[in-house]
A protein has these predicted regions:
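N-terminal strand-loop-strand
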Residues: 1-20, 48, 52
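Short loop segments at secondary-structure junctions
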Residues: 2-4, 11, 75-80, 94-96, ...
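A short, polar/proline- and glycine-enriched secondary-structure boundary/capping micro-motif
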Residues: 16-20, 94-95, 132-133, 143-145
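The catalytic Nudix box helix
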Residues: 21-54, 72
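Intrinsically disordered, low-complexity, charged terminal extensions of DNA damage-control enzymes
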Residues: 47, 57-58, 65, 112, ...
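Active-site-adjacent beta-strand/loop module that shapes the phosphate/pyrophosphate-binding cleft
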Residues: 59-85, 90, 106-118
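Charged phosphate-binding loop/patch that engages nucleotide di/tri-phosphates or the phosphate backbone
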Residues: 115-146
Length: 146
């Protein structure tokens, strides 16, 4: 659906209650891309198609917990988005992203993903409060002149 993004309302685990993209831990023996596809299958009962990596984000929490997040996009999917015990599927108009119901960092980098920009980011959190961030955004590609 053009201009629409398939996200989830997370029902359990870290970030429960928030709107986010499907995702989770990479299992032993998986690549991050394989893990992203498996998580979409588990959380939404869909298989992403045309998957590409958009970014790698690093999160540090003041309690010492840290994680590395590989962000992927897909051009399509197979299956029907279905509610599971982990997530409720939500179609969101990309011009009306519900940032107030998402992690605080999302408003900084989701627009870059939607624009197809390449970037990396580092974020510092104290529980759900973002204390700091650093984004490195690659320059936009020049359009060829004819």
């Amino acid at each position: 659906m053009d201009g629409m993004v398939l996200l989830i309302r997370k029902l359990m685990g870290m970030g429960a209650g928030l709107i986010n993209a499907p995702g989770g831990r990479v299992d032993p023996g998986e690549t991050p891309e394989q893990g992203a596809i498996r998580e979409a299958q588990e959380e939404l009962r869909v298989t992403p198609v045309g998957v590409r990596e958009a970014s790698v984000l690093a999160f540090q929490f003041v309690d010492g917990y840290s994680l590395r997040c590989h962000v992927y996009t897909a051009t399509s999917y197979e299956g029907v988005p279905t509610e599971t015990i982990e997530a409720i599927p939500l179609w969101i108009d990309e011009r009306e992203m519900p940032y107030g119901q998402m992690w605080a960092d999302d408003r900084l980098w989701y627009p870059l993903v939607l624009q197809g920009r390449k970037f990396s980011g580092r974020f510092l959190f104290d529980e759900g409060i973002m204390l700091g961030c650093e984004l490195d955004v690659e320059p936009a590609a020049e359009k060829a002149k004819s």
